[in-house]
Design a protein with these regions (language model features):
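Glycine-rich flavin
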Residues: 53-68, 219
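Flavin (primarily FAD) cofactor-binding/catalytic cores of flavoenzymes
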Residues: 1-34, 38-40, 69-171, 175-343
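A structural motif shared across PLP-dependent enzymes of the aminotransferase-like
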Residues: 46-50
Length: 343
């Protein structure tokens, strides 16, 4: 069978794409390497809560149930994605890993561990969270030091007794630092000045105000969009700020090297560590795409709002694909609708 559209990835981006594809009489399939819908959310750390409230944490066509000003947990989102799939009867093939994507004439050939698929169009919705981005010098740490990427961290029971350094100043690193500060000596290493924003202003989520002010939907090419994009993300909430003030979490500068049980920082200081949590984000890996002009020599994608120079090939779920909201649950629906209209 030759599908009209093959979607690669059944996370929030792929499911949002599926919602719109259901609006047309198109044959399509959503392929995902996972064994369950919502699996990647379930695997995140136990205490994870979104920094967007329920009112800004749903996909097109189905609201996230519950008090709309409350911040949902990771398990709520996982369950929501399962319900979303069932509500719209989306055709998903799980346990399917794409090993190669090629184009022959006017058809795309998707080679997978489950056999070959063919499609007239392909939407790559694997998102940005593909491979943990851990610096090479981490290999210089002793095997006695426990190292975890933030995607592997679940709770404090995984850690060994002693000092913990969390590397990375995003919201995940901030949440983990606050959580661990109640149990052990914690250092937080960041390469930029931290900025903090309240989660709520006047009993409304700050994202409600972002929306009203045009910040949430600021186009990536606008002056506002470029200003926000080129600055580190703020930390939402003031828990970490309080912990830094009372020294429950000790702030360190950027980690530059490691040796045995020591981490070295760019201010010349060092810390003897027992645990390191690399909250350093992810990097993309598109080596499986065997189509010229899509990925450059540095691994960057060639696209405009997810539309590539290759007819019929699209991307979805990228940070700043069109706006600040592109990386968020609610925002991905806007990008999915745009791609849908290009088909």
């Amino acid at each position: 069978m030759i599908y009209d559209v093959a979607v690669i990835g059944a996370g929030q981006a792929g499911l949002a794409m599926g919602f719109y594809l259901k609006q047309k009489r198109l044959s399509f399939v959503i392929l995902d390497k996972g064994s369950k819908i919502g699996e990647s959310w379930k695997e995140r750390y136990d205490s994870l809560k979104l920094f967007t409230p329920r009112s800004y944490s749903s996909l097109p066509g189905l609201s996230l149930e519950g008090e709309q000003n409350i911040y949902p947990t990771k398990n709520e989102i996982s369950d929501y994605l399962i319900g979303y799939t069932n509500t719209f009867s989306l055709p998903i093939q799980l346990n399917t890993t794409i090993t190669k994507l090629a184009k022959v004439d006017e058809r795309f050939i998707l080679s997978t561990n489950q056999g070959e698929y063919q499609s007239k169009n392909v939407v790559v919705a694997t998102g940005p969270f593909q491979q943990p981005n851990i610096p090479d010098f981490s290999k210089h740490l002793s095997g006695e030091v426990l190292q975890l990427h933030s995607s592997e961290y679940k709770n404090s029971r995984q850690l060994i007794k002693g000092t913990t350094v969390i590397v990375g100043g995003g919201n995940s690193g901030a949440q983990i630092a606050v959580e661990l500060s109640h149990e052990s000596e914690v250092f937080l290493s960041v390469g930029h000045r931290l900025t903090f924003l309240p989660q709520d202003i006047g009993n409304k989520s700050i994202f409600c105000w972002f929306d009203k002010l045009g910040i949430y939907k600021a186009n990536v090419n606008s002056k506002v969009g470029q200003f926000i994009k080129n600055r580190p993300d703020p930390i939402f909430g003031f828990e970490l700020k309080s912990q830094l003030k009372n020294r429950s979490v000790i702030l360190k500068s950027r980690v530059v090297s490691a040796d045995e049980k020591n981490l070295f920082f760019d201010d010349g200081s060092s810390v003897v560590v027992s645990n390191v949590i690399w909250s350093t984000g992810f990097k993309s890996d598109y080596r499986w795409i065997d189509i010229p002009s899509v990925v450059d020599e540095k691994g960057a994608l060639n696209h405009q709002r997810g539309v590539t120079p290759v007819k019929g090939l699209y991307f979805l779920g990228l940070p700043w694909q069109s706006s600040r909201g592109s990386a968020l649950l609610q925002g991905v629906g806007t990008d999915a609708e745009y791609i849908f209209k290009q088909l």
